[in-house]
Amino acid sequence: ERSEVEAIFYSKKYEDTLTKIKYNQNNKLKHLISFDNLENTDGIYSLNELIKTGEKLIKNGNKEFIEAKIDNEKMSIMLFTSGTTSSSKVVALSHKNICSNLMDIASVVDVNENDTLLSILPIHHVFECTVGFLFSLYKGAKTVFSDGLRHVVDNLKEYQVTVMACVPVIYERIFGMIRKQLEKQGKLDNILKKEEELRNSSMEERKENFKQIHDMLGGKVKLFISGAASLDPAIEERYRLLGINIVQGYGLTETSPVVAIGTNKEHKIGSIGKTVPSVKAKLVDINKEGVGELVVKGPSIALGYYNNEKATKESFKGDWFYTGDLAKIDKEGYIFICGRKKSVIVLKNGKNIFPEEMENLVNKIEGVTESFIFGKQQSDDKNDIKINVKVVYDKEVVENVYKAKTKEDIYRAIFEKIKEVNSTMPQYKAIRGMILTTKPLIKTTTNKIKRQANLDEINKSEN
């Protein structure tokens, strides 16, 4: 209803749902096109038949498709945001938005017709659509589609992949797999020693020395791009010490999406790199630590939020888009993301807590698969907040590593590790309470934590 869509292409599993929707008076849906049906049926077109009809029209000299005039400033795609802290908004992007971003990426990322890109994330997500799919077409490279998250390493080998753009959790899993194999082979200590010896050497030299590890990934990888969430700087550094070129990129649906990206020549650990050529960035409302909200402008910035004037006015001010992300920018122009403005926890003493930063530390605890940092009100004073964490753990790993069997033993073992995390931070940041579960956190399709949904679930269970 919100998109006012008139036609939908769909696969068989959605047929019953879409048939019901079509006859709902609250929408403008006119056409259903099935990927699976071989023939047109009552009220439903077959994609197969539409292609045949189109071929006939072209043979008969029809040039409507080729001669169609495109207004590159008008909306050509609408995308629903993931809504990690609130309900989703409909982002309106134009041809100009997408194409300018493609050209920006192409000018800084070294990909050519000899490359093979592995597509993993859903293509309805703008990061995968632009970086993992359209960018490949634009550069004449080949795109291969993954068999699923569990098969990424196999796919890297099978398809001799050279470039992959994905989310941090995949790179963390791959790194964990490499480490386990080296431990099993009794080679880990030697590898770690050699990493330090080669710390000041070139990426090529490291690649030659760690050929065995590169072969685990197919032997052809020249670039890993991490996006959609923050990559743990420690993981990023370890990849690069092994001669694996991994960089971080940053963007949002509203920016088509790439705002900034690191390259092999211009790169700093923990940074999302510098802005792409046609995008400008600055900080507003900067605090004493040099952290402010990142605002950006350029031809890839969205037209606004479809049918939502209020939200558009809040985020799009003049030429600038207010990202809602807090960041630092150093003297050389490298951008460092600190966290989401809406997810920052403000304590009674006025100090700011960035949940993402603390979650990275908790996630390093052996047996912890993911975590969610939140503020818990301690009294009637709504500003009296203490830091708590919801920890998702791997039962088998925890039982083996900590020799803990009962819930009480598991809680005690993990909270001892939480105390170790606390000892590395100022006292005001200390985690005071913990919830344990084996149930995964609520996340978006690109593995971002849906903060409000998880907080609602915690509040519901406590009430």
Language-model features: where?
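Adenylate-forming
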Residues: 301, 315-316, 334-363, 396-409, ...
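Conserved ATP-binding/catalytic segment of the ANL
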Residues: 275, 282-284, 288-347, 352-355
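Conserved C-terminal "lid"/linker of ANL adenylate-forming enzymes
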Residues: 372-377, 419-463
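Conserved AMP-binding A3 loop
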Residues: 76-102
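Conserved ATP-binding loop and adjacent catalytic segment of the adenylate-forming AMP-binding
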Residues: 144-146, 224, 231-292, 301-303, ...
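Conserved pre-ATP/AMP-binding loop-to-beta segment of ANL
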Residues: 34, 52-80, 87, 110-116
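Structural core segment of the AMP-binding/adenylate-forming
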Residues: 1-52, 377, 385, 395
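Conserved AMP-binding/adenylation subdomain of ANL enzymes
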Residues: 99-116, 123-211, 220, 245
